[in-house]
Amino acid sequence: MQRLILFFVLCIFLINPPIIFASNYSDGMNAMKNGNHEEAVKLFRVAAETGDARAQHCLGVMLNKGQGVKQNYEESFKWLNLAAKQGFSQAKLDLAILIYHKKGIPENYIDKFK
C-alpha cells in the first residue's frame, strides 16, 4: 500500500512540477516587496528553472537592474528571452528594450533579422 501511495505522489510530481514550486514565485514576490532582494533572486531562480515564466521575467528584470545580484545583461537577456518565448508579454517588452539598447544580446542576434 505504501508503494502505491509513493507511486502516485511521484507521478503527480513528475506530471506537473511547477505546481509544487509555485510558492517559490509567491515567496520571491513577498521577499522583493519586503526589500529582501537577495532572497527574492534565489527564490525566483528556483521557480525560473522549473519553467515559471513569471519568475523568469522577475529574475531577468532583477539581473538587468542589479537588484540583489550583480548586474548581468547577458543573464537578464537569457531569462527574459525564455519568458518571452512562453508568451509572457511584459517579458517581450523588457526584452525589446534590452535589444534596442544592445545590452546583453548575442553578437549575431540582430543579424538574424536583417
Label for each model-derived stretch:
Residues 19-38, 42-43:
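N-terminal leader/linker segments that initiate helical-solenoid repeat arrays
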Residues 21-24, 53-55, 89-91:
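Helix-start (N-cap) detector for alpha-helical repeat units in TPR-like alpha-solenoids
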Residues 7-16:
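Bacterial N-terminal signal peptides
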Residues 1-4:
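Positively charged n-region of N-terminal signal peptides that target proteins for export
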Residues 24-31, 58-65, 94-101:
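Hydrophobic face of amphipathic alpha-helices that form TPR/SEL1-like repeat modules
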Residues 35-36, 49-52, 65-67, 72, ...:
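Short helix-capping/linker turns of helical repeat alpha-solenoids
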